[in-house]
Every structure is written in structure tokens, then in C-alpha cells.
Amino acid sequence: MPKILWIKNNEPEVYARTYKFLTGSSFLAAKLTDNYVVDRFLGLASFNPLYDPKTWRPVPELCAPVCRPDQLAKVQEATDLAGYVTEAAAKETGLAPGTPVITGTDDSGAEAISAGVVEPGKMMIQFGSSIYMILGTRHLVDDERLWREQFIVPGLCDISAGTNTGGSLTKWYRDELFSDALEQEKKTGIDAYQLMLEGVDQVPPGSDGLITLPYFAGERTPVNDPLACGILFGLTISHTRRHLYRSALEGVAYSIQQQLRLMESHEDVSIDQIFAVGGGVNNALWMQIVADVTGREINTPDVTVGASYGDAMMAAVGVRHPGFENFSCLVQHIKTGTVYKPDFKKYKIYQKYQAIYDKLYDSTCELMHMMTEEQ
């Protein structure tokens, strides 16, 4: 909805000529089928509160300040057919005319499906440029520190949360503190991120008293503060760049743990299985740190194509392909790759640092805001 308002306020001519406001997946479906649909998961969440959550239809009085009701797409399930590939689309894409096209959804939702989030207690942690978490729940949770939606799977709700820096933080460290690793990558072909890990596993848990608050680009949940800043707490002259890098990996893990605990603080919410997905799972040390900080097993999938795999699964459900009659059938097609088991000795060490981490934002947010106001 904010994007529609931005177009309305900043590009009124474009707004006036707009036939439909669509998501990325809806746009592709429309180009392929000439039908304008959006899946329930995105429609009710991204366009909130323009659709009635019970009827899935636009509410005229709520749409009035934003757009006309007829400018919104029809809401249906992600696995419902959007239509079939038209002759014109077939010529442009090479797809066979008449190929069924499902409604589809966004990347994170599809990747959650590929990670088995098809029932309560199943969770995906997506390690991309940012960290995104989706946990299947039996009911909607009322907590302004977290997000909640009716999930893609009919009858399943979810809690979602996000840490604004994940892979983007490791990239910043690579570019600013490990430029020699980049140079070596050019010469040897060995990935710079792999080179950055040399010796980091020798730094003890807690990075010798160095805690990173990874709010380098503001923060989403649980603080929802675009003015939040990153902090290196406990930095001394004895720390090396290896300490700084490990502390960054730990800081993201502390953020994840803070949010997992917050989710499970709600009645009838439990985390029974975690699948980690995305580019960050290639960093085995990071995955082990997350397991040790959270005290939970972190599973990685055997198939790592992520959202595309989830899309393929939903397409199979949509056309009722044998063995894919419903979402429950998907579990048998999700195979586990590496499992990172927590070291509970390290978990106890991390609990001490977690307690400090949990207080860092509240202790400094006023100063953060003073700092950003001066810039």
C-alpha cells in the first residue's frame, strides 16, 4: 500500500494511467495469462487493509484514499490457476500455449514452502542480504514487535520476523576489513568469504568479550527502528579483525535467538524444526554459531534452489500432479542435507553474552536517535 501512495503522490500521471496495481508474481501471471490475480498471502498482507480478510474483496471505503477498488487484482490461493499461457505469451517466451499457470507468491513465501513450512512448528530462516524468518502457527499472534499473516497453506498462520543485515553485513566486512581476501580471490579463484574464515574458528565463543549489535541499516523486528545503529560493544586493543568478524556472525545469531524466544513466548507457539536456507548456509561456521547460540538444531536442505523449488512444488499442487495432491504431500519431497547440532557448553557461554545483547538497544536507542538527527 505505501508504494501505491508513493506513486499517487509523486507520479500522478503514472497513477492516473494505471489499470492494476500488482505484485511481481502477479505481473508475470498477468503477462502470461491476461488475468489479474494475487495470492491471498500477499494480497492480505502487502495490500493491508484494502482487502476484507474474510471475503478477500476490496473494501471501497478503505481503498478510497489509496486507489479505486477496480485497480486491485482478484485474491485467490497461491496454488489456484491464474489461467493458461496465451498464444501471444507463448511466442514471446517459448512456453507452450495452454500451459497452466498458478497464481504463485513471493520469494520468501515460496522458499518457506521449500523448507517444509506446511504445518505449525516448522520454521524457515532465510540467510540472504537480510535475515527473514517464517514460523508456521495455529493462530494469528497479536504482537506489534513481530509480523503475522495467514500463510500460503490454507488454514495455517505464521509469525515472521527480520534482521535487516545478514549477508549484507558479511559483505561490508569483506569490502572494508578483508580487501586482501578479495585480491587473493582474483589471483587464486578461492572465494573471499572462505578466506575470511581462516582463524575465525580459533576465536572463542563470545569473541573474547566483543558483542556486535548488527543494526548497520536500521532494524526491523523486534524494534522496528529505521534510525537504529550498529554497535561494537566491548572492543579493546587486543581484538583483531578475526574477532570482529566472528562477533558479527554471532551478533546476527543473537538477533535470531532474541526473536525465536519472543515467538515462543506466545501461547500455543512452538518451534519444532528449523531449516536454514539462502546463500548464508554455505558458511558452515555461521550455521554452527547459530546452532550454539540458539541451542537448537539447524537443518539445511539437500536441494538448495530455494524459492524456485517451492514454486515448482506449488505448481505441482496446483495442477494436482500425482503425489502432490495437497501441501501435506510436500513433506516427503523435502530432504535434509547437513544438520548442525548445538554444543551446549558453548550455548551456556553464549547465554551470558545474549543477556548483554538483549539490553544493548534499549540502553542506547536514545543516543542512536540523537546521532542520526545530527547527520
Predicted regions span which residues?
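Gly/Ser/Thr-rich active-site cleft segment
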Residues: 1-106, 170, 214-217, 245, ...
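Short, well-ordered alpha-helical packing segments
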Residues: 5-8, 29, 114, 174, ...
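ATP-dependent carbohydrate kinase catalytic cores
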Residues: 50-154, 164-165, 187-198, 263, ...
